[in-house]
Amino acid sequence: MQGQKNSVEQLADVFGFDHASSSGNPVMDQQGYWNNILGSVESHNLQGYQVNRSDGTIPYGNGVHQNGTFLGFWESGEASASGSSLHFGGSNEIKAEQRNIGGGLRIGERRLVAERNLSLDNVDIGLNINGNDLSGENSNVNGASQGSELHGGCSHTGSNGQASELRLHPYRTFILGADQPEPFNSLNGSENPLGDFSLMPEGIDQRPGSSLDGRRLACKRKNIEGVNGQCSAGASTSFSHRNDSIFHNIASSSHNPSPSTNLPSPNCLLVPSTLDEQLPRYGATTAGLSSSSYDPSGGNNNSGGSQRSFRPRTSLAQHIGPYGVWPSSSTIRHSNSWNHQPPPFQSSFDEPPEVIPVVSSLNFQYQHPMNVVPGIPQMSHRFTGPGASSSRTGNLENRIIGSEEFSARNVVATSFPDAVPPAALDMRHLIPEPSSWNVDGRATTIPGNVPSSSRANTNSMVNPPAGSPFIAHQNLHRRNPRNLSEEISRLSGALRGHQHPRLRSGFLLERQGDGVWGVPLSTRSREGRRLIEIRNALEMIHRGENVRFESIFYGGVDIHDRHRDMRLDIDNMSYEELLALEERIGNVSTGLSEEEVTKLLKQRKFSSWRLEASVEEEPCCICQEEYVDGDDLGTLDCGHDFHVGCVRQWLVVKNTCPICKNTALKS
């Protein structure tokens, strides 16, 4: 082997690394083809960078893809003599690799000469490969400022001239429904503590692949090209779906610059790499991460520097619907908490985006064991660690994909896949207890499987539904008692303002009048009407009008009689009025003929001795004369007696009894 030689030149042909072997670090002589990677800006920035001659431990290896295409990868070590090296390679297991590395600066700790011409803020990790069949997601991993990590890239261009750019991804890429691509072989058989880092092609134009555009995006807080991702002050990360069958995870990582120590990635998570171990964390169950596995240093990093805020991106092939919570804040500091809500990425690039509410970041101080409903992707994950804090306390940004913004204090919604009916949800098992919200106890209750935090932290979780009629009787969230009373008062006022006047009923009158004297209003109203009728009747009698008993106690006096003009009071008419009425009515005969009267009328002789002494004989009401013994009397069917001559004439005119007004003779 030759001596140590590390060179970085402005060449478009060959970029080579030659390494000498050492006792604890076997290396290989490899040559990577550097084609069309360094532009004018990158070439200009690399002029002021000098490589330390003692940096001889940069292992460089290659892997073979399915179609035999060359793939290069490299590793980065630490400053200590025995440290864990950052391993970018392919393997089906998590391997920890302990190496005894010689002295000298490493690729993650290189110092800049003079005025630090090379900016290490946002240097993309780009590995181009001709394997177009490898499906994955692109990622722009931008390092923090002050030069903590320098990521270089190498590419290989195939014969067809179409090189799909591969980017280093901190977690493995899982492909469902397709064959798993061959992993990259590791140079050393020892284990790597940080796991395998897969390479994914970039085939979507949502995020540029050049490092210059990556630096521009990382320096700005706002999203320039509308890419579904987030941009923080210290780092920028963007991911977009390439295939529907990608299971994608990203761990939260942060870097706090310190003049004495250089940690490669103090907050990297050690996450299982197999699909069976990843699936229980998303979709069907709720899993939490302990603070010890999250922060190896065990310290509180809230005071130093900006920190990357990653969210795990999850995409399963049409088995788990799109769901998630997007962070609305750009700079969020976390010490031992990891907001791992996956965003609602699309299954394919051509599908329209689904409108899902987006709320601010989550700060939970208590871990609550949530009940799991089979077949429903769980939106609520456990959050551990009491040190979670937000650098923008009091700033609530609730957003919806599609540029709709909510200014409400808490956004409450539910969302389930279309395959899950509303009846399959048991809201009693999904509403958390108040102990899982926050210490202050002012949290709101949200129906569904999502707990909400308090108003002081201005945080909320989202589980969006498919419309307002969805579970109308179960989706009414309970607010604080004061807010609930205010809502009810406003609602009742609005209903009273738009309500039409209704007719009075006895029930309403009774309800309104109760409680004064203990007597229902309906009873008092009846008694009042009786008194009014009696008073009116007395007034009519005082005026000399004809008043009947029935008119007082059976229906009341007709004070306002609409048919008064149509009625005729023949008792108070004069003779002339009766003649005029007779002429107007005409000759109306309702009596019987002479033959019928003679045939049907019962006759007898009057005899005074047949009468009892106590009974006084009344005279004939028709002729008003006394009966004399031997007079002929006629008896009607009702039992009244009259003179035969008088009653004959009466029956010919009218077939009624002059006394009782009943039918005189029934033919």
Curated annotation (Swiss-Prot):
Residues 142-163, 285-311 are annotated as: Disordered. It comes from the Eukaryota. Residues 288-309 have a biased composition (Low complexity). A zinc finger (RING-type) spans 620-661. It catalyses: S-ubiquitinyl-[E2 ubiquitin-conjugating enzyme]-L-cysteine + [acceptor protein]-L-lysine = [E2 ubiquitin-conjugating enzyme]-L-cysteine + N(6)-ubiquitinyl-[acceptor protein]-L-lysine. Pathway: Protein modification; protein ubiquitination. It is an enzyme of class 2 (transferase). InterPro entries: MBR1/2-like (IPR045191), Znf_RING (IPR001841), Znf_RING/FYVE/PHD (IPR013083). Induction: By pantothenate. Its EC number is 2.3.2.27. Gene3D superfamilies: Zinc/RING finger domain, C3HC4 (zinc finger). Signal peptide: none annotated. One of its GO terms (biological process) is protein ubiquitination. The keyword Lyase does not apply. One of its GO terms (molecular function) is zinc ion binding. SUPFAM superfamilies: RING/U-box. SMART domains: RING. Keywords: Growth regulation, Metal-binding, Transferase, Ubl conjugation pathway, Zinc, Zinc-finger. Interacts with HAL3. Probable E3 ubiquitin-protein ligase that functions downstream of HAL3 and is required for HAL3-regulated plant growth. Activation of HIP1 by HAL3 may lead to the degradation of cell cycle suppressors, resulting in enhancement of cell division and plant growth. Belongs to the RING-type zinc finger family. The RING-type zinc finger domain mediates binding to an E2 ubiquitin-conjugating enzyme. This is Probable E3 ubiquitin-protein ligase HIP1. The lineage of its organism: Eukaryota, Viridiplantae, Streptophyta, Embryophyta, Tracheophyta.
